[in-house]
């Protein structure tokens, strides 16, 4: 034993001095740690406000990501296990009472941060969006697995737009708001760009969100409601259409709109499936464009070294399937027409085409009435909808889908409304000259070529279509306008065809199908004459289709319905780009 080591106990004063020295040393260490944390936060984290220039904001966030990587942290984790979706969380725990916090429940959610506020350095509130619903996340240092400095440092780095994963327990705050009280908290995918600010007093917040037992439902717009895109958080049309993901993120009505589009398509499929129609798929590229009057897109097949046309319609293929024995077929898919773009036309659009053996255009009018009136009633709860037909600055009109729909005979109505006579032999040169004179008389513009088909189409648009607000069938088109339709039984020169117009726009085109191969070849020959006159929308001769008809097409009715225009009506949309997720846009 070393006699130089003293074993005498320290005096009380010495103990006090030693205790004070340790406390002072600990305090200095805490100050240093806090200073280091503060410097790290200033160096690596973005400021809480969004006042920075967007370019600087992006640069700062990129530095933050790189800093995390240098620290050995993956800023984009591979996996986060969630126990339920946010809508399921709301449904399951909406019954909790104010101030009730069942801490024994361990669950996890994930979603996008759409708002954030700090009550103090130890308490943060987030609004988490996912699955069309939003819920509050309450992050408290008390529930955290790290100390207060680390907690504050981490929370300061979480920004609006970040996708986060939260594990915790449910509860209702003192204000009665359902929340998840966070324990572990992880950023799964940072949002590097500055998001538009949500206007807390906007129409979106005050009238487009509903409160249910203290929970805010976000995507609460329903079909039949009016819309006003001017009230959106993100309002610039170009940005909304070019960056649809941002539009969906910021504007809950837009998400609800596209859910409605999906419901429309689902309703059509269910309706037709219940009638024992078979859904099929047909080629999008072929040597001919298909059965419609439109200008096609052209592409080149390298392997075959041949020019191919992108389909304007699947009509001829579908009728070949009826020849083959599929008595009821339909196709829901994309069509392409290399023509102009405006508020109701897109070069890429969605159609439903169906063909029904042993049916005629009268049967299809009944089917169309049942389908559309039933759909409107199912989606909106009424046969009547309101629609801003004349723009958002004017009062909406009412459109009534109550069956039966009105029927108008095309030529009889045209003669009556315009007080003119229409020659019955419309294939003659004299008839063409007469229609040119009529168009000039009423100042009806018809760009060349002045084929009889185009002249009639312009006159019908000028005198009849403009008055078709409620669903209206325009029926019995001339043969010269309908190369694939069967002649009318009682009136030679006319066909068993109808167009359905709603709000002055064509929604459906249907007819009793021409199944006589000899007559079909003659009709194609008439179309060739129009093409030689410069009408590039006239149909080409399709020999393979004529051959199919020679094997025998049963009496058949066919219908085409525009999904985009139908969706416009049921979502109060005035621009077709509103209802197409990624619409065609002009080059910037």
Swiss-Prot record:
Renumbered to this chain, the Polar residues biased-composition regions fall at 1-10
Catalytic activity reported:
tRNA(Lys) + L-lysine + ATP = L-lysyl-tRNA(Lys) + AMP + diphosphate
Q: Which GO terms describe its molecular function?
A: ATP binding; lysine-tRNA ligase activity; tRNA binding
Q: What cellular-component terms does GO give this entry?
A: cytoplasm
Which segments show compositional bias classed as Basic and acidic residues? 20-47
UniProt-listed Enzyme Commission number(s): 6.1.1.6
Q: Share an example GO biological-process annotation for this protein.
A: lysyl-tRNA aminoacylation
Instruction: Give the residue ranges for region: Disordered.
Output: 1-54
Q: Which UniProt keywords apply?
A: Aminoacyl-tRNA synthetase, ATP-binding, Cytoplasm, Ligase, Nucleotide-binding, Protein biosynthesis
InterPro entries documented for this protein: Aa-tRNA-synt_II (IPR004364), aa-tRNA-synth_II (IPR006195), aa-tRNA-synth_II/BPL/LPL (IPR045864), Lys-tRNA-ligase_II (IPR002313), Lys-tRNA-ligase_II_bac/euk (IPR034762), Lys-tRNA-ligase_II_N (IPR044136), Lys-tRNA-synth_II_C (IPR018149), NA-bd_OB-fold (IPR012340)
Instruction: Report disulfide bridges, numbered on this chain.
Output: none
The listed locations are: Cytoplasm
Cross-referenced PANTHER family: LYSINE--TRNA LIGASE (PTHR42918:SF12), LYSYL-TRNA SYNTHETASE (PTHR42918)
**So what family is this one in?**
Belongs to the class-II aminoacyl-tRNA synthetase family.
Write down what this protein is called: Lysine--tRNA ligase
Its taxonomic path starts at: Eukaryota, Viridiplantae, Streptophyta, Embryophyta, Tracheophyta
GN (gene name): LYSRS
